[in-house]
Amino acid sequence: MKLQKLRNIGIIAHVDAGKTTLTERLLHFTGALHSMGEVHHGGTVTDHMVQERQRGITIASAAVTVGWRDHRINIIDTPGHIDFNIEVNRSLRVLDGAVVVFDSVAGVEPQSETNWRLADQYGVPRICLVNKMDRIGADYLRVVAMIRERLGAQPLVVHLPVFVEETYVGLIDLTTMSLHRWNADDGWKYSSEEITPEYQEQAAQYRAQLEETLVELDDELLEGWFNGATLQADDLKRLIRQGVVSGAFVPVLCASAFKNKGVQMVLDAVVDYLPSPQEVKGMETVDGAQIVDADVDGAFAALAFKVVNDKHGALTYVRVYRGTLQSGSRVLNTNVGQYERIGRIYEMHADRKVARDRIGAGDIVALVGMKHTQTGDTLCAPEAPLVLERINAPEPVMDIVIEPKSRQDQDRLGEALRAIVGEDPSLRLSTGAAGETLVSGMGELHLEIVVDRLQTDFDIAVTVGRPQVAYRETITQSAAVDYVYKKQKGGPGQFAEVRMRFEPIAGDGIEFESQIVGAAIPREYIPAVEDGVRQAARSGVLGGYPCGGFKAVLLDGAYHAQDSSQLAFSVAGREAFKEAMAQATPRLLEPVMAVEIVTPRDHVGDCIGDLMRRRGSILNQLDRGDACVINAEAPLAEMFGYIGDLRTMTAGRASFSMTFSHYAETPQGVADAVLNAD
């Protein structure tokens, strides 16, 4: 198939906006699925994990392929829960377009904003879908306004919903100025008719706005439009596509996926408005020396964006950016400098595999036989090595202790955890001070799924400690240190001297700078100093928590021609950091969460009072229909078990969502309690 007829898209949204239901309908309406499943019945294709079907949520991104109007569409359905945001991150990294789904009542929600920023970061063209138009209180134009105000985007109204009394029955397509009305009993069937009188004025108003926006993209059409020329539907669709690809605006559609209304128009929009691999900007290499454009005739280049372990071994999901690949070929993993032999190639349909002998630029497939490849690694032709930008995983904010109930399972537990962590870059595996196994993740649900998988997928009974906050440490003042490492016990010794300055910086990262002039320290030893600092920063001086938010500057030093080594300078850097941190007024940092609560108005006071008792701060209050939306920030340490307390306060009528915001200094009294407890 020609690249022009290929679409690689993702379905992204806040949890419960209807992503998976929409994906199920897309599969059904394209003929890829004969019998539709439902999320609430645990029978959908893309939610195939046991944990997904039990909980009715998407946990892992799933890839499926469908055909529509002679086009092939690779679809990745992503999770909406913040704990699994790494799945959205790595999916957007390899996609050419996205359908962003919004609930017609809730509108733009916290995870909608997080996903939107990720799509901005990767420059992914988007179309928006206001879903669940059958809900009581559905307000399409209010959601359009929220897209403009909360996301800073330029929404382009392409559809208008049509209601009979309060029942959603169809939509007006402003490009063709026709009304599509669905059969009440069969979403496959709809009629296209003239716009009814009660909608003609509104349709004319929004059609004029649509034309006014689009003609700005074409000088010739603009001149004709000013002279009264009528714009044709094909011209409008071409200009919408042009604006979507350039990021000038986002078309907004409407539908009710669950009621099977509007699904065909979503598929049409994917084909008409979202770009092919050839229409998006090529992928830049890490060194900036190359732009990898979609070209089947070039040297092979691909990015591994996901690794999944199933009963048959590891599946490595890749996006091919350039060239072609056949099963049995040998490729180079440039991140680790290892060659890989491709065993089999599969086109994935959720958990079902279709074998392929050959793939090319634009394809998203799974490879079997990878032994050294992890998420974010580049695979390429050995004769044309390059490195693509890796996928950055967020830092975990919560830890749990996991131990096997039987000592005989200790080794199996380690192997299982390494397999799970290998699949999910937002998980971390470490050993605590007492030798216990620590698993760090993005939230309570994230870690619950890990425990559930250990017991269900690996048949290992475990005991689990209470979730703990992933604290950090930082410095608040500058400190200078002159450290000499000298070791002499007969034979070759060890010697290294470093003079360093450590200073606080914004954020929680670590920066290193060498100001060495001349040959005070040979160039080959300077990376060892940085490595020593970074190793030491894994365990701060207050409570052994990771340390960040500082810059290390190597000012001067000395070496010995016979006794100096990389090891000696690494030790010197490590010990210099420890001394400096003790002098630089270290402080404990805690993760602060962005919290959104949707509550009936008569419970607003209770919710705000409870948040204040949890050391929270209220950012704003907004009206949403008959409810009130409270936006706040609160320390994660105070939010464990919050959902139960909220249900009690509001008789089960309120809901909330929580996303990581930033790290902030822990109040001294709280910090003392945390450190003394440790």
Swiss-Prot record:
Binding, GTP: 13-20, 77-81, 131-134
Keyword Magnesium belongs to the record: no
Domain tr-type G: 4-278
Highest rank taxon of the organism: Bacteria
Coiled coil stretches, renumbered: none
Main location: cytoplasm
SUPFAM superfamilies for this protein: EF-G C-terminal domain-like (SSF54980), P-loop containing nucleoside triphosphate hydrolases (SSF52540), Ribosomal protein S5 domain 2-like (SSF54211), Translation proteins (SSF50447)
Cellular localization per UniProt: Cytoplasm
Gene Ontology CC annotations of this record: cytoplasm
NCBIfam families per the UniProt record, alphabetical: EF-G, PRK12740.1-5, small_GTP
Name of the protein this chain belongs to: Elongation factor G 2
Species of origin: Hahella chejuensis (strain KCTC 2396)
Lineage: Bacteria, Pseudomonadati, Pseudomonadota, Gammaproteobacteria, Oceanospirillales
UniProt gene name: fusA2
